Amino acid sequence: MRQSGRKSNQLRPISLELSPLINTEGSCIIKIGNTHVMCSATCETTVPPFLRGQNQGWVTAEYGMLPGSTSQRIKREAAQGKQGGRTQEIQRLIGRSMRCVMDLKKLGERQIIIDCDVINADGGTRTASITGSYVALHLAIRSLMKKRILKVNPLISQIAAVSCGIYKGEAILDLDYLEDSDAEVDSNFVFAGNGNLIEVQGTAEQEPFSEEQFIEMLKLAKCGAAELFKLQNQVLLGT
């Protein structure tokens, strides 16, 4: 039994609040335990220079943590004049993950910007951001089609992400901050709706981990992602 009382294969309580923002095409607040992230999707009629004139769209992402999202105040990166390496890594992960489930030709010469702002951090902010970003992106595409800006749906798959790790010798699903900070292995799995993998990140914090341990984490992650897909469908089909 984990410190939180969860079983090794148990996700934290999850909720998705749809459309908290009124000025974007799509938005949601995802809550996974005490990790809360605001995700929004905004459509612009410009694309990066390398795509101009190609009648193809783009999806990119920005990620940030509010100063009060952790126990000690985080300095705003804007005030420091540059983004940290972790921020850049996470927003690139979110962006390329979203592009994997989009037919960019069907988007036309438009860019969708995903914004992920961490309101409260208790582990798994990047995976929560990806899972919530899909919901925001889905709502944005729905809005663009309703307005007849898009004629066909460019979304080709669901997407969700979840963390796994080896903690005190045991494979566990969806690590909170205390588990993550003391885990022997920390990994993140990004899945498409059919169960195929989009990205895997895995790091041994103390000593190398075995293939058997990796397979065990993969199985846990796949089951966790299936639960996330089910929740996404429930909230989106109910609107």
Curated annotation (Swiss-Prot):
Quaternary structure note: Homohexameric ring arranged as a trimer of dimers.
Signal keyword on record: no
GO biological process: rRNA catabolic process; rRNA processing; tRNA processing
Coiled-coil annotated spans: none
Record-linked InterPro entries: ExoRNase_PH_dom1, ExoRNase_PH_dom2, ExoRNase_PH_dom2_sf, PNPase/RNase_PH_dom_sf, Ribosomal_Su5_D2-typ_SF, RNase_PH, RNase_PH_bac-type, RNase_PH_CS
SUPFAM superfamilies: Ribonuclease PH domain 2-like, Ribosomal protein S5 domain 2-like
Name by which UniProt lists this protein: Ribonuclease PH
Disulfide feature: none
Catalytic activity from the UniProt record: tRNA(n+1) + phosphate = tRNA(n) + a ribonucleoside 5'-diphosphate
Binding site for phosphate: 86, 124-126
One Pfam family cited in the UniProt record for this chain: RNase_PH_C
An example molecular function term from Gene Ontology annotations: 3'-5'-RNA exonuclease activity
Functional summary from the UniProt entry: Phosphorolytic 3'-5' exoribonuclease that plays an important role in tRNA 3'-end maturation. Removes nucleotide residues following the 3'-CCA terminus of tRNAs; can also add nucleotides to the ends of RNA molecules by using nucleoside diphosphates as substrates, but this may not be physiologically important. Probably plays a role in initiation of 16S rRNA degradation (leading to ribosome degradation) during starvation.
Family according to the record: Belongs to the RNase PH family.
Keywords annotated in UniProt: Nucleotidyltransferase, RNA-binding, rRNA processing, Transferase, tRNA processing, tRNA-binding
Organism: Rickettsia akari (strain Hartford)
E.C. designation(s): 2.7.7.56
